[in-house]
């Protein structure tokens, strides 16, 4: 139900206008990372969470776009129920799972939810979180973009793990999980895998740090940005394929580019 109150319309128009300035019509899929602290403080005083999330997403859905949002649960054991297990991430991540026409991928650690005409892209994925037949791989060549709303680029970019797996980063290793995956009570399988940090190298925790890569990225023409990541007021759009290629190139130039500390294997 759309509330015709002024606060909702104001927020809706705020985001719609920003999206238009970012040329969202060049894209069909929007992979969204979000932190609403700044935006909510300015726009959501009298809005419910539902109304605010609608104001963010509806302008895209009404342009026939598909939005994809991480709904990670990190279910490393026991049962992951695709249709029920809540996400351990933030506001938009929880909100999207409550929507009537949502589709959700099946990975017990790293699932994604989608709304819009292409939402089924996230369904029936392979068992690898970031690798073959994953949401990340499927978005390649699909007129996709990554949209950071109130989140600096260097703080969130799971796409780098897809790149690390693609390029054979030696500081990560593939790990399988015995979590049993169900959807609406139907058993789908187990042994879903993720390419995770190694824990066996003394003096290295392999924490990822995207500061250096982000600085280089801003020197390219890839990010289009309105607002300022320093106070979380940014809306930043990056072409998904161009961003992926940039990360691949960065990795081959420097195998430690995504790490907080240099690692020589």
Locate each region found by the language model.
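N-terminal and secondary-structure boundary signal
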Residues: 1-265
């Amino acid at each position: 139900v759309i509330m015709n109150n002024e606060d909702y319309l104001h927020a809706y128009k705020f985001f719609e206008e920003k999206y238009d300035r970012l040329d969202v019509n060049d894209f069909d899929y929007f992979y969204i990372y979000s932190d609403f602290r700044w935006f909510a403080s300015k726009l959501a005083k009298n809005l419910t969470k539902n109304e605010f999330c609608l104001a963010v997403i509806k302008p895209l859905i009404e342009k026939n776009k598909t939005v994809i949002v991480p709904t990670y649960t990190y279910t490393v054991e026991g049962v992951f129920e695709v249709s029920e297990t809540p996400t351990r991430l933030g506001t938009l991540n929880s909100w999207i799972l409550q929507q009537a026409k949502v589709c959700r991928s099946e990975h017990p650690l790293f699932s994604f939810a989608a709304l819009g005409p292409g939402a089924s892209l996230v369904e029936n994925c392979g068992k690898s979180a970031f690798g073959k037949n994953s949401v990340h791989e499927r978005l390649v060549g699909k007129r996709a973009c990554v949209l950071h709303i109130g989140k600096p680029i260097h703080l969130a970019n799971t796409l780098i793990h897809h790149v690390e797996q693609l390029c054979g980063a030696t500081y990560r290793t593939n790990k399988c999980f015995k979590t049993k995956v169900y959807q609406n009570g139907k058993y789908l399988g187990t042994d879903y895998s993720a390419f995770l940090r190694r824990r066996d190298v003394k003096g290295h925790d392999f924490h990822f740090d995207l500061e250096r890569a982000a600085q280089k990225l801003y020197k390219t023409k890839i990010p289009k940005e309105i607002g300022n990541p320093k106070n979380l007021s940014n809306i930043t759009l990056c072409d998904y394929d161009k961003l992926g290629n940039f990360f691949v190139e960065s990795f081959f130039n420097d195998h430690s580019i995504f790490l907080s500390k240099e690692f020589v294997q």
